[in-house]
């Protein structure tokens, strides 16, 4: 698998992978991604800022991840929108993406990697813990919003 920066013309591929993963989560009862216009605009902006990466096998996009600096702490990178097209899940690709994020953090002089998961998504929380992330507890940014669990990993 190759991990490379997404280019503007790959936005539809990123959105497609996220939509398919969103459908899968909805089938599990996890309402997390909604693929709204805000998602489209946010992802487009993140691609322009070189924060979105594609997971590619044989020239086919099979996943995506966003890795960008935390607005409140420039020494922290935030991992979000980690999505692997369902037929490619359970093949050990997600740990490779997390390893890539860790290498990127080191290269950029970051000392912490952060991520959040919906409280209902036990498998993503387990993946993060298996890869050295520490559960920091739950958060609810605003009333009626999703409750998520924060995870952090110190980079040494």
Residue map of PLM features:
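Acetyl-CoA-dependent GNAT
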Residues: 8-11, 16-87, 98-100, 104, ...
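Active-site acidic-Proline motif in GNAT/NAT acetyltransferases
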Residues: 85-87, 91, 120
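Residues forming the Rossmann-fold NAD(P)(H) cofactor-binding site
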Residues: 95
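Conserved GNAT acetyl-CoA-binding A-motif
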Residues: 98, 105-117
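Conserved catalytic-core motifs of GNAT/GCN5-like acyltransferases
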Residues: 116-118, 125, 129-149
